[in-house]
Amino acid sequence: MQYLYIFVGGALGALIRFCLSMLNEGSTIPLGTFVANLLGAFLMGSIGALSLSLFKTHPNIKKGLTTGLLGALTTFSTFQFELVTLFNQHHFILFTIYGVTSYILGILSCYLGVKIGGRFS
């Protein structure tokens, strides 16, 4: 049964990811990946905090949300590829800003998600 939850979550995450990737069209800045990864970090923190109480009795829902939805939504490999592309195109300032802000804001988003999710658990 857990595979069904992961499958459905993955389909939803992939669809959201695809829609966000349209923000990248015609732009040097990979905004879609940036938004997807920050949103995913925030939601992972929230779900992680909520799982302490809410998902104890529903572990399949947690797997569907984390492994399925957020696994398909976020993408480390695309992020790395975009960084390499920016570097190869000699966009060194954008490369640095995108890399540094993605990591710092990703950690802060996850932290904020943990704090907010913890209030509801």
From Swiss-Prot:
Keywords, sorted A to Z: Cell membrane, Ion channel, Ion transport, Membrane, Metal-binding, Sodium, Transmembrane, Transmembrane helix, Transport
Localization, UniProt: Cell membrane
Protein family according to the UniProt entry: Belongs to the fluoride channel Fluc/FEX (TC 1.A.43) family.
Coiled coil start-end: none
Entry annotated with the keyword Metal-binding: yes
One MF term in the entry's GO annotations: fluoride channel activity
Regulation: Na(+) is not transported, but it plays an essential structural role and its presence is essential for fluoride channel function.
PANTHER family: FLUORIDE EXPORT PROTEIN 1-RELATED, FLUORIDE-SPECIFIC ION CHANNEL FLUC 2
NCBIfam families: PRK14201.1 (NF010797)
Any GO CC annotation of this UniProt entry: plasma membrane
Gene: fluC1
Full protein name: Fluoride-specific ion channel FluC 1
Binding site for Na(+): 71, 74
Membrane topology per record: Multi-pass membrane protein
Catalytic activity: fluoride(in) = fluoride(out)
Principal location: membrane
Residue pairs linked by disulfide bridges in the UniProt entry: none
Transmembrane segments annotated in the record for this chain: 3-23, 29-49, 67-87, 92-112
GO biological process terms held by the UniProt record: cellular detoxification of fluoride
The keyword Ubl conjugation belongs to this UniProt entry's keyword annotation: no
Role description: Fluoride-specific ion channel. Important for reducing fluoride concentration in the cell, thus reducing its toxicity.
Domain of life the protein comes from: Bacteria
